[in-house]
């Protein structure tokens, strides 16, 4: 908890060096993605409760993004189990402008032993090509904007057809999905995360 509090304060102060130092500390180097994720939730809650200003939350997110980019560029060694838990293709559609959450998720999955390929704003043709040429266990889509839902069922159907793995699992998540998963049954996904629930 102390590490989260310190990281939260450092990012609100836009203190990049301190924030990186907290994440890179040997004692918590294996859990830094969770610290960033928890702080993002705190920023969101504080903003909704009018506890921080727009300037503060914008600066905090900007600093957090810099920290994430720095940690990923450093290639911090994976700790814990090094087993091959499976291959995942995680995609952010071209109609989406977000990628922050997807980058965090990809890093957390890698640390859990998964081989993750992350595609951000890439053409569908390129995605289908990789699905066809490489065996993946999971095809995941992170959807943050409602316009990305348009034609999504067709993308999923095409992904299943072209996939080298005929039993590939299709998993969806992101802020566009709210309410009961049954409302999105027309997408024919194997797993749908709505507000952290499946």
Where are these predicted regions, by residue range?
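A short, charged/proline- and glycine-enriched loop
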Residues: 80-88
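Cofactor-cradling patches in redox/metallo enzymes
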Residues: 119, 123-183
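Long amphipathic alpha-helical segments
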Residues: 1-79
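Conserved small-residue-rich beta-alpha loop and adjacent elements
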Residues: 96-100
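Peripheral docking tails and interdomain loops at the edges
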Residues: 175-198
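Short helix-loop-beta junction
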Residues: 103-116
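Short hydrophobic beta-strand segments
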Residues: 87-95
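Glycine-enriched alpha-helix->loop->beta-strand junction motifs that scaffold or abut catalytic
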Residues: 115, 135-137, 187-190
């Amino acid at each position: 908890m102390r590490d989260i509090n310190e990281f939260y304060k450092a990012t609100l102060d836009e203190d990049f060096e301190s924030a990186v130092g907290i994440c890179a500390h040997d004692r918590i180097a294996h859990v830094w993605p969770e610290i960033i994720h928890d702080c993002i939730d705190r920023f969101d809650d504080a903003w909704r409760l009018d506890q921080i200003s727009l300037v503060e939350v914008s600066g905090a997110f900007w600093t957090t993004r810099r920290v994430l980019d720095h940690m990923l560029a450093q290639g911090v060694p994976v700790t814990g189990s090094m087993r091959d838990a499976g291959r995942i293709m995680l995609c952010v559609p071209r109609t989406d402008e977000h990628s922050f959450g997807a980058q965090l998720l990809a890093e957390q999955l890698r640390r859990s032993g998964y081989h993750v390929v992350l595609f951000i704003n890439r053409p569908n043709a390129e995605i289908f090509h990789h699905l066809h040429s490489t065996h993946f266990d999971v095809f995941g889509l992170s959807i943050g904007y409602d316009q990305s839902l348009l034609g999504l069922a067709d993308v999923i159907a095409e992904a299943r057809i072209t996939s080298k793995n005929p039993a590939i699992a299709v998993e969806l998540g992101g802020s566009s999905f709210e309410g009961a998963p049954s409302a999105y049954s027309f997408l024919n996904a194997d797993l749908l995360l709505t507000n952290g629930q499946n």
